[in-house]
């Protein structure tokens, strides 16, 4: 936990924010539930789930199920899902993108991470316990307390990855409870005809100018990896939606904000490759690009989405070996393949190949970020004019930046629901406003916006935090220091992201602060905004040149404010004698000068900022002029004025950074993945 009392005293030392800061007692809040009162207090944002739970429990009894586990994902382990797959949201009322619920005959609980704790308190009714962790061991312990020995614990095996199933199985092993896969989804049964219909979007081919290579070249590369593998697999099973989309240079609109379509692919080493698409006719528009190799080893055979299990079962009757990624292939599909015919790795060769962008893909993503910066700069200038007049609320702000992005060339809309959060709402890391409940932006409060765009040439994601009044600068500056320290790091090849991510936290740690979410994630070329397996978590692959990742430290004080600074960076070769790597930041929007306390920065950090601002001027300035945005161009020149490097800078910060760098170089030699 945070040293809250000490921390509050520390913030009172900052004159610019001491006068306006008033601690808020939990009892005065009306935006979250209070289950201790009689009757319980529920905010308007909470959902009454009593009838849904009663119906689910009836269905559980009919199937002899004592505990039922419901995840937040779909059959492809997608983070963003269609309304039809939002089972957790329908059952609980919780709309966050990550969570797990368990229902027994007399209890119900939701597990989610710190990004969503306050959101859950706003959306859950008092039928639900909120468990502030995501550990499967914690879920299993709760289940063992709630379910007697001999009880059946069930889940839908087509909604849990192999890795997650194994974790549950291990956590419950020897407990006397049975983990029972149940292919009939009990939530779907209760949801009934109220469940949204399947998507019917068209699949289309990505124009050649926006692909790094042809799909035939990509297939040849994957087959080469199959031949070179010691196990010589005969097929690769692709179940991540972005895998099939990337491999065949196809896109669709089955999931909001994500240009993907429901599909599986079984890529074999011979003439048959099956693309299982929801409603085969939906793929007719792109059939020409796929059938060009028929007959022969590059002939794509289209099959119905619902046939994947039967086809996989039939294929594995032969003398075959199927390669799959256990992190995101479902236990339901995995269970069809005989154990001796499996090649299990965390990620498929398609997933790892997609993560490393070639030179063409890198240029496409850079270009997308230049135009995206134009839209964000337009938004910042608009905010400066309109917020002091009280004309903007969170929802209208989100709508405005979405519209600015849509006006840019090659735009396909936002890459996720825009996070537009002022004051205490910014303490919710993934808060999104609605038309019905939206705070007015104020010059006296922090405003955090985390937004992104989908363009034919790339996907973007950027967060800026701004303030138009007398600000609290220390928290913002320490978050910025973390962003800078990780962005300018030089590190050995093959370094695991988890070994360096603490640099983004160090300036916060120095004063006993932290943040609860991850430091970064991969990003796609007109694909997913959160692209596996790149990032700084323990199950991410080692960093390699050509990978793109976000760098996004933050700091949040519940009920008061939130700060996050996010940029997208490309892993590139460093200018060193031996093969080392570093980051090239491709997000090109200046930070809020009003919030930067230069006295906390080292001279190296200020020099980095000045170099970054020079790059922004060089790359975004001409694009603003090309689009005849003269006022925005002048705003950019003013906002990227170089910072003074001199006596105001503390030498301690420099010395400490040098000491940390030398320590890190020693640590990294033993921590490479």
For each feature predicted by the language model, list its residue ranges:
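Cleavable N-terminal signal peptides of Sec/SRP-targeted secreted and luminal proteins
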Residues: 1, 9-20, 656-668
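C-terminal GPI-anchoring signal of eukaryotic secretory precursors
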Residues: 644-659
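Active-site neighborhoods and metal-handling regions in enzymes and metal-associated proteins
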Residues: 6, 17-647, 668-672
């Amino acid at each position: 936990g945070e040293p809250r009392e000490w921390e509050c005293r520390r913030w009172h030392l900052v004159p610019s924010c001491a006068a306006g800061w008033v601690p808020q007692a939990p009892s005065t809040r009306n935006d979250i539930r209070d289950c201790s009162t009689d009757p319980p207090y529920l905010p308007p944002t909470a959902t009454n789930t009593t009838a849904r739970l009663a119906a689910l429990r009836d269905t559980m009894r009919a199937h002899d199920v004592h505990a039922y586990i419901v995840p937040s994902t779909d059959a492809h382990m997608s983070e963003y899902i269609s309304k039809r797959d939002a089972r957790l949201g329908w059952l609980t009322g919780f709309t966050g993108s990550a969570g797990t619920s368990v229902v027994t005959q007399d209890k119900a609980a939701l597990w989610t991470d710190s990004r969503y704790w306050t959101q859950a308190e706003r959306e859950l009714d008092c039928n639900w316990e909120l468990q502030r962790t995501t550990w499967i061991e914690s879920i299993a312990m709760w289940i063992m307390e709630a379910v007697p020995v001999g009880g059946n614990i069930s889940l839908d095996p087509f909604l849990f990855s192999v890795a997650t199933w194994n974790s549950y199985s291990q956590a419950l092993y020897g407990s006397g409870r049975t983990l029972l896969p149940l292919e009939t989804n009990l939530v779907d049964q209760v949801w009934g005809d109220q469940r949204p219909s399947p998507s019917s979007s068209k699949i289309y081919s990505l124009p050649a100018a926006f692909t790094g290579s042809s799909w035939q070249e990509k297939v040849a590369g994957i087959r080469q990896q199959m031949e070179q593998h010691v196990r010589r697999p005969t097929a690769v099973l692709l179940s991540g939606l972005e895998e099939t989309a990337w491999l065949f240079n196809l896109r669709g609109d089955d999931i909001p904000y994500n240009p993907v379509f429901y599909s599986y692919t079984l890529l074999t080493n011979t003439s048959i490759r099956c693309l299982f698409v929801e409603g085969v006719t939906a793929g007719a528009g792109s059939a020409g690009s796929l059938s060009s190799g028929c007959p022969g080893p590059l002939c794509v055979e289209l099959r119905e989405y619902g046939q994947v299990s039967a086809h996989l079962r039939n294929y594995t009757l032969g003398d075959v070996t199927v390669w799959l990624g256990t992190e995101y292939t479902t236990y339901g599909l995995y269970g069809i393949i005989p154990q001796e015919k499996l090649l299990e790795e965390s990620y498929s060769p398609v997933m790892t190949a997609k993560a490393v962008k070639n030179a063409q893909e890198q240029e496409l993503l850079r270009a997308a970020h230049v135009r995206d910066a134009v839209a964000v700069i337009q938004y910042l200038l608009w905010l400066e004019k309109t917020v002091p007049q009280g004309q903007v609320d969170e929802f209208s702000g989100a709508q405005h930046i979405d519209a600015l992005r849509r006006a840019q060339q090659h735009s396909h809309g936002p890459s996720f629901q825009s996070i537009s959060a002022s004051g205490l709402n910014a303490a919710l890391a993934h808060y999104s406003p609605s038309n019905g409940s939206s705070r007015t932006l104020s010059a006296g409060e922090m405003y955090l916006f985390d937004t992104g765009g989908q363009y034919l040439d790339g996907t973007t994601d950027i967060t800026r935090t701004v303030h138009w009044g007398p600000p609290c600068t220390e928290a913002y500056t320490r978050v910025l220091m973390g962003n800078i320290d990780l962005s300018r790091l030089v590190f050995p090849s093959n370094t695991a992201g988890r070994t360096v991510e603490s640099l983004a936290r160090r300036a916060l740690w120095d004063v006993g602060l932290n943040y609860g979410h991850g430091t970064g994630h991969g990003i796609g070329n007109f694909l997913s905004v959160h692209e596996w397996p790149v990032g700084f978590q323990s199950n991410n692959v080692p960093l390699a040149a050509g990978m793109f990742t976000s760098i996004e430290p933050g700091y949040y004080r519940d009920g008061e404010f939130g700060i996050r600074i996010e940029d997208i960076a490309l892993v590139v070769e460093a200018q060193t004698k031996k093969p080392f790597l570093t980051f090239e930041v491709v997000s090109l929007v200046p930070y809020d000068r009003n919030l930067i306390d230069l006295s906390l920065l080292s001279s190296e950090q200020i020099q980095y900022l000045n170099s970054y601002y020079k790059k922004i001027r060089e790359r975004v300035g001409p694009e603003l002029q090309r689009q005849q945005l003269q006022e925005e161009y002048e705003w950019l020149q003013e906002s990227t004025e170089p910072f003074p490097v001199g006596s105001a800078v503390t030498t301690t910060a420099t010395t400490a950074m040098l000491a940390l760098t030398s320590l890190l170089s020693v640590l990294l030699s033993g921590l490479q993945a």
